[in-house]
Amino acid sequence: MTVQVLLPGVLATLAGGDKHVHVEPAGTTLGDVLDALESQHPMLGRRIRDETGQVRRFVNVYVDGDDVRFNGGLATPVRDGAEVQVLPSVAGG
């Protein structure tokens, strides 16, 4: 199974500049996708998940356009060919 992870520029720098990263997760959940992403890009994984392995509060993750916070979190099913978009919150004033 192959999943495409879409990253904004601020996170793409941690993936060698790639805004589109393809991963082959060991399973079929978002957690498996993030494990595979972290395996390829450890620094990126630490920006997305906290020390307990949960998605950080200021990071929004979407599977095929659906916010995972409302669809099972890390247990959200991910299909072959899915797009996972990772968007960190931006604050300023």
Regions found by a protein language model. Give the residues of each.
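Ubiquitin-like/PB1-type beta-grasp interaction modules and other compact soluble beta-rich domains
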Residues: 1-92
